[in-house]
């Protein structure tokens, strides 16, 4: 009675009864809709089953641990718990087979529990199935929907749960992770290894059992999710329980998402339908499946050109501008849809285009936006910005004002961070002066404005270098034609910067300098590929001497002591590869556009560096 009085008083003080009534109305609306839908055909696996009355619960989202403040009569009938036994408690007690149990039953799926927790933390709706138990221990399947309820200010005040219970027949004596058949076996094994009276027995017993006493939810959500895919694979070899847990596809996806970021894992989602997350993570970590292949596509890109810029938008390659005959700046846009049965280049019809240019950059933001910056036009160098939404019904190039822009330039480098911010670095002015500045433009704001990134020191001015993103906001700069005293020389140095720092600063990447360690030869206009795991692959470009531009070099800039290593790849690589004409598609495909004969580019011929297994047929 005291608990009920305290709960009632608290809800009265914060005027929450009105919200509960709203929640009940929400539930009643659901019943009415359900009755209306009874005549509709139901498929196996659908969420609602009209023959089973739904249970409704409401929890307080403003209190820690989401305590229950309301359950309906159906809940009491199906679970065997009275309202006064459960109000003020988190509803996880339904995962316990016995009311006195201290942890949930091992057959309850920890991944579903983790997903529920994530949805509650992010304030989004959840739908799924979960094993529950009646008060007497009878197993139930709970088809559950959780929906947040917000107040006028948008604050989540309550969470309503709609539950459809059905009895299930499962073998409760079977555990999901059979680490040991009996605890006695563990005791006997420990006794054999270490006498029970020795200090080693106690040390071994505590160390061995400590982590296994954690629930699967804690292991998955709080421990495994914080590790790299490589570390998770190693942990999976420790015992059968951890092996089963690390083999769970949802756990593997959660590990990859936390290690690589939501944007990258979202891009890789289509690959997991063929390879699944475990194999994909292994192949991207070990690079065991990497290979070159060559294919041709249809269509025509006319007029012929060089010095164009290309990028990937989903599974589409986009080409803009370039240098035509007699150094004519071109302003057309072409797209190649790799999902098509017979991919072919097609011109994008637009009402107006940005001024023609070459030596510019073309980037993809927000999944479907194309962003053009700078380059050399008819009247000299440019510093304008144009955006086109490729998914729009009628794609249109629109100029972005951007406040005070950077100096006009060409042969600069650009990249995108956090999916929506354009970063521009270096390049060359009309007078031939090399630049060392770095600018950022956030195109998601109402009035995008260029912002220069102030640093106490910057790498030598350069053009033709590469910018590669790793760790979400960190950038690796490599190569280019850089100032070296009074000379301009190809560079082989690498630098990093973290734009999330309060005071970002450039740092030269200090690589291991052991005898015999390989380093990429100095180069410019090369290819730099950012892998999902944060490593960077360098190849191609303009190189002096007898070095092969097709040799691949790999580095992990996040390592404490980074070192370059050569990546030997089977297959026939392209003879030449340039950064402005190479795209990364889906995180696992590096496409090099065309070879060329003299001044003529062959854009119907593509070389692909496959970072993961391809299970479809060649194009």
From Swiss-Prot:
It holds the Pfam family Kelch_KLHDC2_KLHL20_DRC7. The lineage of its organism: Eukaryota, Viridiplantae, Streptophyta, Embryophyta, Tracheophyta. It is found in: Nucleus; Cytoplasm. Residues 211-257 form the F-box domain. One of its GO terms (cellular component) is cytoplasm. Interacts with ADO1 (via Kelch repeats), ADO2 (via Kelch repeats), SKP1A/ASK1, SKP1B/ASK2, ASK3, SKP1K/ASK11, ASK12, ASK13 and SKP1N/ASK14. Interacts (via Kelch repeats) with CDF1, CDF2 and CDF3. Interacts (via N-terminus) with CO and GI (via N-terminus) in a blue-light-dependent manner. PANTHER family: ADAGIO PROTEIN 3, BACTERIOOPSIN TRANSCRIPTIONAL ACTIVATOR. This is Adagio protein 3. One of its GO terms (molecular function) is photoreceptor activity. Belongs to the ADAGIO family. Changing residue 163 to L: Decreased interaction with GI. Pathway: Protein modification; protein ubiquitination. Disruption phenotype: Late flowering. InterPro entries: F-box-like_dom_sf (IPR036047), Kelch-typ_b-propeller (IPR015915), Kelch_2 (IPR011498), PAC (IPR001610), PAS (IPR000014), PAS-like_dom_sf (IPR035965). Kelch repeats lie at residues 304-354, 357-404, 409-457, 462-513, 523-571. Component of an E3 ubiquitin ligase complex that plays a central role in blue light-dependent circadian cycles. Acts as a blue light photoreceptor, due to the presence of FMN, that mediates light-regulated protein degradation of critical clock components by targeting them to the proteasome complex. The SCF(ADO3) E3 ubiquitin ligase complex is involved in the regulation of circadian clock-dependent processes including transition to flowering time, hypocotyl elongation, cotyledons and leaf movement rhythms. Forms a complex with 'GIGANTEA' (GI) to regulate 'CONSTANS' (CO) expression. It comes from Arabidopsis thaliana.
């Amino acid at each position: 009675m005291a608990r009920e009085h305290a709960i009632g008083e608290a809800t009265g003080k914060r005027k929450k009864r009105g919200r509960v009534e709203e929640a009940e109305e929400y539930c009643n609306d659901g019943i009415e809709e359900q009755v209306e839908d009874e005549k509709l055909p139901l498929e196996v696996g659908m969420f609602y089953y009209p023959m089973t009355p739904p249970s409704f619960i409401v929890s307080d989202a403003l209190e820690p641990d989401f305590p229950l403040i309301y359950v309906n009569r159906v809940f009491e009938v199906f679970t065997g718990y009275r309202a006064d036994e459960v109000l003020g408690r988190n509803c996880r007690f339904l995962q316990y087979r016995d009311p006195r149990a201290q942890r949930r039953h091992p057959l309850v799926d920890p991944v579903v529990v983790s997903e529920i927790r994530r949805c509650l933390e992010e304030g989004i709706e959840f739908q799924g199935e979960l094993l529950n138990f009646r008060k007497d221990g009878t197993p139930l399947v709970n088809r559950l929907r959780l929906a947040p309820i917000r107040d006028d200010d948008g604050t989540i005040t309550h969470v309503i749960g709609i539950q459809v219970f059905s009895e299930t027949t499962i073998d409760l004596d079977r555990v999901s992770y059979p680490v040991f058949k009996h605890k006695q076996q563990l005791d006997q094994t420990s006794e054999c290894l270490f006498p029970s009276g020795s200090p080693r027995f106690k040390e071994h017993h505590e160390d061995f059992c400590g982590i296994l006493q954690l629930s699967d939810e804690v292991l998955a959500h709080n421990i495994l999710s914080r590790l790299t895919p490589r570390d998770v694979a190693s942990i999976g070899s420790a015992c059968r329980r951890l092996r089963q847990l690390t083999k769970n596809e949802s756990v593997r996806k959660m590990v990859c998402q936390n290690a690589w970021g939501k944007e990258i894992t979202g891009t890789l989602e289509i690959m997991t339908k063929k390879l699944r997350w475990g194999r994909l993570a292994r192949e991207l970590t070990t690079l065991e499946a990497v290979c070159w292949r060559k294919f041709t596509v249809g269509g025509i890109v006319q007029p012929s050109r060089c010095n164009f810029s290309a990028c990937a938008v989903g599974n589409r390659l986009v080409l803009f501008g370039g240098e035509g005959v007699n150094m004519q700046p071109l302003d057309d846009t072409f797209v190649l849809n790799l999902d098509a049965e017979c991919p072919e280049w097609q011109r994008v019809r637009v009402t107006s285009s940005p001024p023609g240019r070459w030596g510019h950059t073309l980037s993809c933001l927000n999944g479907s936006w194309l962003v053009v910056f700078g380059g050399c036009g008819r009247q000299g160098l440019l510093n304008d910005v144009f955006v086109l939404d490729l998914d729009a019904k009628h794609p249109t190039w629109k100029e972005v004002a951007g406040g005070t822009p950077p100096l006009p330039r060409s042969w600069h480098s650009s990249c995108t961070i956090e999916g929506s911010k354009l970063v521009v670095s270096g390049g060359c002015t009309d007078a031939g002066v090399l630049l060392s500045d770095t600018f950022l433009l956030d195109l998601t704001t109402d009035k995008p404005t260029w912002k220069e990134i102030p640093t106490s020191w910057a790498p030598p001015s350069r053009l033709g270098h590469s910018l590669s993103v790793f760790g979400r906001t960190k950038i690796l700069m490599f190569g280019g034609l850089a100032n070296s005293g009074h000379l301009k020389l190809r560079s082989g140095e690498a630098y990093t910067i973290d734009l999330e720092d309060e005071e970002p600063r450039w740092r030269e990447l200090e690589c291991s300098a052991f005898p015999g360690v390989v380093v990429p030869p100095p180069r410019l206009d090369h290819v730099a590929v950012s892998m999902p795991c944060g490593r960077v692959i360098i190849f191609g470009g303009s190189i002096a001497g007898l070095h092969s531009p097709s040799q691949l070099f790999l580095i992990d800039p996040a390592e404490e002591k980074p070192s370059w290593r050569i990546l030997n790849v089977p297959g026939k690589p392209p003879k030449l590869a340039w950064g402005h004409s190479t795209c990364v598609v889906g995180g696992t495909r590096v496409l090099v556009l065309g070879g060329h004969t003299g001044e003529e580019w062959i854009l119907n011929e593509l070389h692909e560096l496959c970072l993961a297994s391809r299970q479809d047929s060649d194009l």
